């Protein structure tokens, strides 16, 4: 098969492009490429991409990836000459990611990682496109020892537990990606992403930092569903987006961890948020929820070696940017009455 011509810019497909990570990725890709954003808004949000809709190099397609996608037949993509140029790169991020809703959308989560991943891989095969899959540290399960997770660790997972639809879904998707890559000689990359945070995170999906910030801005108790000595790691969104782009540009194919290896006490994160918001909130500890899990640490040696990547944004700086964006969210009751500049 002859290589399709590339006109003035590459055509890039981003599934889950209206989500927290996907929308930030689209912001960067649109600077040099034509971007096709796919989402069905199960956990993505339209306001994440509103600012991109008038850009002539951006096109949003509302579609459930568990259904086949015949991209070349979409009339709205004629301007990208997809029928002639095809798609050069695919970033597959689409997966419902809302810990508080795992028990509400388990089948949707499993199908996105199985049927959905297969459908997008078929597009990659048809277009001979480079393929990047955003996996998760969840495939490792809970740590059995203090050592950071390396890519060659197989994981300790409960296949029928409260988080199984997400954890096992990601594990199956990784297997699908790797086997498609081998069978069809595709260039595939898998990024196992550890905790990340930043502007545009949903305020209601059960993630720790948005929950803490929302509580602090409303003056409510900050509830920590873990022991007082519990720790975790957090990577700011701009560092994560840089890692994703470096991975796609690199010659590296395979699996790589992406995360911040700095281990932080959760209570210290809560106290920092209270300080930055000038909140009167108090910290209370509660019994862990069913969908919560003990977090492991990332070993990012391979990311440093193969991608030349490591996180550079300090937690405090990332929290300030996240809080500034969340203060503008109308869904957070009472924020407009707080004086943050005193």
What kind of region is each of these model predictions?
Residues 1-196, 238, 325, 329, ...:
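N-terminal Rossmann-like NAD(P)+-binding domain of SDR-like oxidoreductases, especially those catalyzing
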Residues 4-5, 27, 63-66, 119, ...:
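C-terminal substrate-binding subdomain of Rossmann-fold SDR/epimerase-dehydratase oxidoreductases
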Residues 43, 199, 260:
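Short, conserved catalytic or interaction motifs in soluble domains
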Residues 44, 97, 203, 264-265, ...:
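Short alpha-helical
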Residues 54, 145, 161, 201-205, ...:
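Residue-level signature of the cytosolic catalytic core of signaling kinases
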Residues 67, 110, 201-202, 233:
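Nucleotide-sugar-dependent glycosyltransferase donor-binding/catalytic pocket residues
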Residues 117, 209-210:
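Amphipathic alpha-helical segments in well-structured domains
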Residues 172, 176, 180, 212, ...:
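Hydrophobic alpha-helix immediately C-terminal to the catalytic Tyr-X-X-X-Lys motif of short-chain
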């Amino acid at each position: 098969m002859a290589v399709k011509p590339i006109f003035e810019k590459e055509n890039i497909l981003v599934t889950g492009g209206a989500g927290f990570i996907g929308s930030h990725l689209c912001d960067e890709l649109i600077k040099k490429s034509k971007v096709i954003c796919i989402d069905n808004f199960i956990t993505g949000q339209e306001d994440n991409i509103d600012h991109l809709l008038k850009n002539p190099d951006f096109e949003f397609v509302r579609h459930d990836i568990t259904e086949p996608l015949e991209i070349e037949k979409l009339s709205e993509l004629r301007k990208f000459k997809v029928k002639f140029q095809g798609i050069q790169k695919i970033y597959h991020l689409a997966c419902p990611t809302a810990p508080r809703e795992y028990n509400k959308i388990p089948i949707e989560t499993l199908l996105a990682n199985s049927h959905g991943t297969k459908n997008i891989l078929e597009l990659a095969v048809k277009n001979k496109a480079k393929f990047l899959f955003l996996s998760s540290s969840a495939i490792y399960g809970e740590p059995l020892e203090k050592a950071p997770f390396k890519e060659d660790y197989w994981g300790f997972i409960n296949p029928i537990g409260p988080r199984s639809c997400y954890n096992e879904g990601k594990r199956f998707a990784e297997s699908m990606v790797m086997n498609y890559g081998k069978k069809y000689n595709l260039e595939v990359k898998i990024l196992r992403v550890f905790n990340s945070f930043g502007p545009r995170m949903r305020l209601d999906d059960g993630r720790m930092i948005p929950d803490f910030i929302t509580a602090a801005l409303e003056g409510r108790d900050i509830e920590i569903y873990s022991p007082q000595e519990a720790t975790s790691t957090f990577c700011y969104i701009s560092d994560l987006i840089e890692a994703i782009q470096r991975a796609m540009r690199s010659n590296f194919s395979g699996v790589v961890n992406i995360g911040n290896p700095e281990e932080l006490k959760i209570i210290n994160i809560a106290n920092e948020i209270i300080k930055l918001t000038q909140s009167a909130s108090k910290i209370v500890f509660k019994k862990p929820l069913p969908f919560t899990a003990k977090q492991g640490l990332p070993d990012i040696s391979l990311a440093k070696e193969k991608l030349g990547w490591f996180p550079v944004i300090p937690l405090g700086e990332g929290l300030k940017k996240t809080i500034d964006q969340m203060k503008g969210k109308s869904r957070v009751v009472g924020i407009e009455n707080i004086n943050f500049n005193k």
